[in-house]
Amino acid sequence: MDLTVGALPYPPGRQARHQPRTGETADSLNPDQIATDLDGPAVVSSGHTLRHSLLVRNLTRRELQIATNGQITAVVVDPATGEVVGGFAGAQAMPLLIVRISPGHADRIPLLIGTASFSPQLGYAVPAGKWGIRATLTLGPDPASSPRKRTPVMPLTITA
């Protein structure tokens, strides 16, 4: 029998069956084309999930299309190194919902922030402290072939 707590196997020391998707292979967004920010401070208790919003501003001269499942899922990063240390580890519905943003306009996209640890050294939940989050945006209507770009690291406070 395989048990998983959050994103990590139980008992500790076993190999995880599935590796979380972290968006590590995506390039960074061009800040001259797309600006992103949190819609207010992001504060969540360790071991819990926060539903927040990502503000996305289209600085280009063409419509921006972002493929989502109704939200974008962030990963938690160490702000000093950029290393992904956690995020959301549960199941999600996967409908294809395209967010369209006209040139020069902005929109709020729901943002899912989980605190399950992806690092055995941190335990099963990312501990309290000042962390960062970033999200990967799929820039086009086809999740399989559209380019993926990462947001800059944004501040996250995790409380006990």
Regions from the PLM with identified roles:
Residues M1-P31:
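A eukaryote-biased signal for short, well-structured alpha-helical docking elements
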Residues P11-R14, V43, T157:
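Intrinsically disordered, low-complexity segments enriched in proline/serine/threonine
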Residues D27, D37, R57-L59, M94, ...:
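Preference for short coil/turn "hinge" residues that link or interrupt alpha-helices
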Residues R61-A160:
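Extended, well-structured beta-strand/loop surface patches
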